[in-house]
């Protein structure tokens, strides 16, 4: 997606068939919406035809390699991450959804995306690249791994309960996502420690269940209820 200012209006084009068309358009901002696997390749392909004052932008959920690429490109940039997708979010009402803007980004680029995300009623947070990766490792890898485990041990149910059906819907939605995207999120260097936390909690819970420890279960439920307040 390429954008440029015409007077005080923003002119946006999202369909180009050749690099020459992009060159003639002379964009002031390029938003790279390629899938995670091809984000860097897409940038490298168009860099030679972009004006030097063009702002590069991505909306990738995985930022691996992007900071280094931007710093070496010589271009200004703005990196953001809408923390939702069409699988689960209600795109007609995004007021409960969030977006992250990378703090190292160019000032004008940040202003553009703040205005855009505010117009969608999103909750906006500004994180560094490192803080973003830490957040993704926590907020995505934990539910992803938990869902994977549910799917792995699941058996077909003739009369599933409400909770089971809700978990099933989440599992089907998550597993419809691109394999490479799931892989890259889980291969975040910060993910293993989050998965280790899950294993620790499962071990503790299994001991309580195996021992039929009513007092231990009461304490455990009290602890986790406090977590979700």
Say what each PLM segment does.
Residues 30-32, 57-58, 101:
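Redox-cofactor binding/interface segments in oxidoreductases and associated redox assembly factors
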Residues 20-47:
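Rossmann-like NAD(P)-binding element
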Residues 15-19, 125-128:
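Short acidic-hydrophobic, aromatic-tinged amphipathic segments that line or gate anion-handling sites
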Residues 62-66, 70-124, 133:
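Rossmann-fold dinucleotide-binding core
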Residues 50-54, 75:
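A short helix->loop->beta-strand "cap" motif at the edges of active sites that frequently abuts
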Residues 1-12:
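Single conserved hydrophobic/aromatic residue that forms the stacking wall/gate
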Residues 126-229:
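An accessory alpha-helical subdomain
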Residues 14, 28, 54:
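Conserved acidic residues
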